[in-house]
Amino acid sequence: MAKRIKTPADIGALVRIVRKEQNLRQDELAGVAGVGLRFIVDLEAGKPTAQIGKVLQVLQTLGCSIDILAPGERRK
């Protein structure tokens, strides 16, 4: 499922949806992703100052990937 992400809240919502689809609790995701429970709670709440490295770590753990398109590029 491709999602257009424009805000930290969009990332948080995506993380929550995918986590629930995988039947993971927040503490379980935190454990397998190697981050703290507070980080997952804040991430899902759309905290705008979440550390990008940890965000990428959580997304990778969930099996998500990020495609960044330069101006003028189109999704293939």
From Swiss-Prot:
Domain HTH cro/C1-type: residue ranges: 15-69
Residue ranges: DNA binding: 26-45
Molecular function terms, GO-annotated: DNA binding
Gene3D superfamilies: lambda repressor-like DNA-binding domains
Matches recorded under InterPro entries: Cro/C1-type_HTH (IPR001387), Lambda_DNA-bd_dom_sf (IPR010982), Tscrpt_reg_HipB-like (IPR017507)
PROSITE patterns, A to Z: HTH_CROC1
CDD domains attached to this UniProt entry: HTH_XRE (cd00093)
Keyword list, A-Z: DNA-binding, Plasmid, Transcription, Transcription regulation
Record protein name field: Uncharacterized HTH-type transcriptional regulator y4mF
Lineage summary: Bacteria, Pseudomonadati, Pseudomonadota, Alphaproteobacteria, Hyphomicrobiales
